[in-house]
């Protein structure tokens, strides 16, 4: 479950970053600011993707990370502490970087770019839906895979 949610979210972020590089004409994080103002669909898509990859509710990665953390606490409590610490550090780093990129003063653009946001938002929609509902057959499939892997 976690690998599926992570893959969907990460690919959505990659779609967003590719569009950002086209629109801004750079891949340098320090030169990209204010995306939610200058390119709202792109900026908010990136924000949602980063929030999802950080494992915040109600998105699907939260559910999978919660299951991982709670299982770790139940089986190996000493391993759960560094796991939670690592998740908190990752969240802090993502938040620190994302603040200026999304909400800072907008920087220059190369101009309009013809790009589809369908893949970005389709992947994010699946991750969002998975935070609330997983169909029974999909849950059974994930459980069978988990049993096979031990």
Residue ranges and their predicted role:
Residues 8-13, 146-150:
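Alpha-helical transmembrane segments and their membrane-interface exit regions
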Residues 9-82, 108-127:
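Interfacial and helix-entry/exit segments of alpha-helical transmembrane bundles
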Residues 77-97:
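Alpha-helical transmembrane segments of multi-pass integral membrane proteins
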